[in-house]
C-alpha cells in the first residue's frame, strides 16, 4: 500500500507530531517527540551546542518545501554550509521500503539522505529543474549507543539540502539486504547543523547505498568502539543473525578496537571470532564478505606511512583464502 505526500498542495506542509505521524521536523516537533534527539534513533542531525536549540525549520512555497534557518542561526553561519529540510513519516513496522521523491532544484548542489543520515543521492540541479528519485529504506531494530536494549525507529526520516521537496511516496517492498557489522569507521555517524559536508564524521557504511543498485537495501549495525567480541556481547549480532536470508550479503569490518585488547590478537581471538561469524552467516544462506580494517593516519619520524593495522589486514586476507 502506497502512502503519498504532495507538498505542492497548499497547507500540506505541517510540523511533525506523534499524534499525526507525518510532517517536517522543527523545534516544535522535537518538543513533541524528544526521542528524535537521540543519535541513531532518527536522522542523526545534531545542532551545534552554542545555538541553544534546534536551528532548522521549514518553509513551504509553490515549488515545494525547503529548509529555513531558525531565529537562533545567524545568516553568516550558513556560509559554506548547508541546512537540510527534514521530513518524517511513521511506518507500519519493521521491513524494507521503497521511497520515491520529487525535487525542484535551486541552482546548485543537492544531497538526499534517508534514515540515519545515509547518503542516497547527490548531484546538481539547475534552477527549477525537477528530478524524481527512487531508493530503498531499511527499518530494522538496533541497540543505540549508550543503551542496552534493541529499539525500533519505525519511520522514514528523509532530509534534503539544496532543493525543494515536492512529493514523497512510501511503500513496502521486498528486496535483498546488505548487512554491515563493524566499528566507528563503518557506522552511521551524526553531523552538526549547519551541515559541513567536507568536515563531518561519516562511516563508509553511511554512504554505501549511494553506490549500490536501487534494489539493494543497506542495514547498518556497526557502532563506534565495537570489536568482534562486543558486537555479540552488546546484542547487535542477536539482531542481525535471525534476519539474514538467502541472497543477502553481510560485510564484516573490525580491527581498530580489537587491536587494543590482548585476547583479540590478530592471529588469536580476532580471527577465531571472525571465523565463527562466517560459519553462522553461511548457515543462514547469506554471503559473508570480509573487509580489511581501515588503517589510521599515522606516520613514522622520517615521514613514511605507519600502518598499525597491517597485521589485522593480513589476518583477514589469510582467513578469506
Residue ranges and their predicted role:
Residues 222-225, 294:
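Short, solvent-exposed turn/loop segments enriched in Gly/Ser/Thr/Pro and often Arg
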Residues 167-222, 237-249:
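Serine-esterase "nucleophile elbow" of acetyl-processing enzymes
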Residues 1-189:
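Compositionally biased, intrinsically disordered or flexible polar/acidic segments
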Residues 184, 227, 257:
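Gly/Ser/Thr-rich beta-alpha loop segments that engage phosphate groups in nucleotides
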